[in-house]
Amino acid sequence: PEVNYLQEKITYSSKNIIGFENLFGEALQTQDDIEIFGIMHFPDDYDSSQKYPVIVASHGSLNWRAHHLDYLQQMRQANYIVFAMHPFDSRGVNSTVGNQINVTSESIIYDMATSLNLLWDDPRINNQKIYAAGWSLGGTAALFNAWRPLQEALNLPNASFTGYLMWYPGCL
């Protein structure tokens, strides 16, 4: 579909993580870095002199679908910047339905944490209003990013999501 508002593709570093224990400590450092991306979707009346709240959003196991994009539009229209993570497209995967090893929950959990760190010091962002949102597999990422031990292991000092919105999250 045609887009009539400001967007920005942002690349950043993440990892392909297999095994929840590999999100912590020295095990995390043994995982190779990869480059992934997300798309910033700006409000219609975006003003670069203001700081905006942001929603970091992640899709479910069938990638971004039309109903997800409808929600992203509503968020934008409510004057939020939406950072739509692209964990599948970044890794050349279309779906994990039937094969959850292509892109693991742990990888998307890590992608979301690194998204927070990426946006924390962005001058366009009000870092006291960064929210995590996700559907299914993406909801699992939001759920685990609310867990204090994970925050202490992965987030920048004092960085945290302000709130969490999950549609039918799974579990590990």
Regions found by a protein language model. Name each.
Residues 2-50:
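N-terminal cap/lid segment of alpha/beta-hydrolase-fold proteins
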Residues 26-36, 50-121:
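Serine-hydrolase catalytic machinery in alpha/beta-hydrolase-like enzymes
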Residues 41, 57-58, 133, 167:
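Short hydrophobic segments within beta-strands
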Residues 106, 112-172:
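Primarily recognizes the serine-hydrolase "nucleophile elbow" in alpha/beta-hydrolase
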